[in-house]
């Protein structure tokens, strides 16, 4: 699999060794068509005010953000949702987070999809009083890469994954659990978790102290 979790969701890696089965898309500049064969299912997920037609759909919930809390390097299975928490860029906190949060959820005060020239603010939420200030990151490219649809509406050529390599690894781990081969299953799960723990320096070094 790819060494950094964040690389999975960048368009340039959409057919990497991480991808087992994915719905294919293309940019109009790559396939020489008028409009490309974009992923229309995610066309409205661009961050409000960040893209030419970002409608801020597919909003991450506070419950999802809370689920990324960690304690001593492990998920907080029982008390993660006891109170509302969220990281703030540059603010010291005793609460630690799974690095995958910063690859998954766009949050005010942080770079949008790793790019410091595009900082996300509270103004980048279309309906904050209803749905909050978070935005989804996995479905969109970096802002500097631009949109991939040559028309009045935005669309992206990001991959629509059905199975990733790590999904297959987890299926194997689950089968090993059923066979009572728990040590082997644990090794696979820990391998995946270690990849997540290491996915800091390349893209989200600004969040290193929070993980």
Feature-to-residue mapping (PLM):
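Acidic/polar-rich alpha-helix caps and helix-coil junctions
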Residues: 1-39, 74-211
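Short, cationic low-complexity segments
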Residues: 37-67, 123-132
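Active-site-adjacent helix-turn-beta-strand microarchitecture at beta-sheet edges
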Residues: 70
